Design a protein with these regions (language model features):
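Outer-membrane beta-barrel proteins and related beta-barrel translocases across Gram-negative bacteria
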Residues: 1-340
């Protein structure tokens, strides 16, 4: 259940989320070799069973009742050209199990988590009326710069490693201090010609630098910061760079890279090209690399609109490391245009 409201004359926004459920873990009784994946990313040999790893870690498959309530207050305000929004978050989670097999020293079944932080951002722009290029399809240029910062400190009375992770958005809550510095550059132009002119984001460059306190628990080989809910972030000092270039109305290119500052390596990278051949057909090519699992994948996709309501997407994936097909996916989508 979600409840949102404004209080104190609209100066403070309140958002409450509550959930209750009966959850359990189900373990895969197969090996990485049988699933066609590399076990290195899971700390396994190719012939080790996933179920044995879970059992050795103290995880069980019994049903558990769980209740979780999250309350957030935010007070956005304008300080000159800067938008500032301090926020306060509290969360209570209860289970009908203390998970003593996973963590013998942990005897509590109710966790209290709290955090406070601030978000701030501003925007500056400049218009270049004299920019014209038939080659790059540019007609004037607006350059917008959006610097931002998000900082948060949180604590909990139960460490996230002492409870099994049924749901990463409930059990896996980060504690400690985290700061994200962001800089977004957006270049806009006019495209479409007389009578059809429209504003287009021709190039977007988004740079994020994330750093945290030394006591943050790192649970993922690829760090990630989630600005709208920092407690769900994957800890680790890193730089994330994304880029999107709309070459023309039919061709677009995207790229992403996550550089792990703790390990001094490129943890994840991706590059893609999308081509819209007609209103009915779109194709794309995407390359993805993940350092931890030594994966290098190449995916080619065809999306065809069969009718106004049906479309089909075919996505074969090639493993560049093994020089063999990894998977072939087929997705059929049915739209309901009359349903709002």
């Amino acid at each position: 259940a979600h409840v949102a409201d404004s209080i104190l004359g609209g100066r403070v926004t309140s958002h409450m989320e509550a959930r209750y459920g009966r959850v359990r873990m189900r373990f895969v009784d197969r090996t990485p070799a049988e699933l066609g994946i590399r076990g290195r990313g899971f700390g396994l040999a190719q012939d080790d069973l996933f179920s044995e790893l879970a059992s050795q870690a103290g995880l069980e498959s019994a049903w558990v009742h769980r209740a979780d309530v999250r309350q957030e207050f935010s007070a956005p305000m304008d300080l000159g050209p800067v938008r500032v929004a301090p926020f306060l978050v509290g969360r209570v989670t209860a289970w009908d199990d203390d998970f003593s097999r996973l963590s013998p020293e942990q005897t509590e079944s109710v966790r209290i988590w709290g955090g406070l932080g601030v978000r701030a951002s501003t925007r500056v722009q400049r218009v270049f009326d004299g920019v014209r290029s038939m080659l790059l399809d540019l007609d004037r240029l607006r350059w917008t710069i959006e610097p931002s910062v998000t900082a948060m400190y949180s604590e909990a009375d139960i460490d996230q490693r002492e409870v099994p992770e049924f749901d990463s958005s409930v059990e896996s809550l980060a504690t400690g201090a985290t700061v994200e510095l962001g800089l977004r550059n957006v270049f806009q132009t006019h495209r479409g010609g007389p009578g059809r002119s429209r504003s287009v984001d021709v190039l977007r460059l988004d740079t994020r630098l994330v750093t945290g306190s030394g006591d943050l628990y790192r649970e993922s080989v690829v760090p990630r910061f989630i600005g709208w809910r920092p407690e769900l972030s994957q800890a680790g000092d890193h730089v994330r760079q994304t880029a999107a270039w709309r070459v023309s109305d039919s061709v677009a290119m995207t790229a992403e890279g996550v550089y792990d500052l703790d390990e001094d390596l490129l943890a994840r990278s991706a590059f893609g090209v999308s081509v819209t051949h007609s209103p009915l057909l779109r194709t794309y090519l995407e390359y993805r690399r993940l350092d931890a699992s030594e994966n290098e994948l190449l995916e080619l996709g065809w999306q065809y609109r069969l009718s106004p309501t049906y479309s089909v997407l075919v996505r074969p994936t090639w493993d560049l490391k093994t020089d063999d097909f990894r998977a072939v996916n087929l997705t059929v989508t049915r739209r309901f245009p009359d349903v709002n």
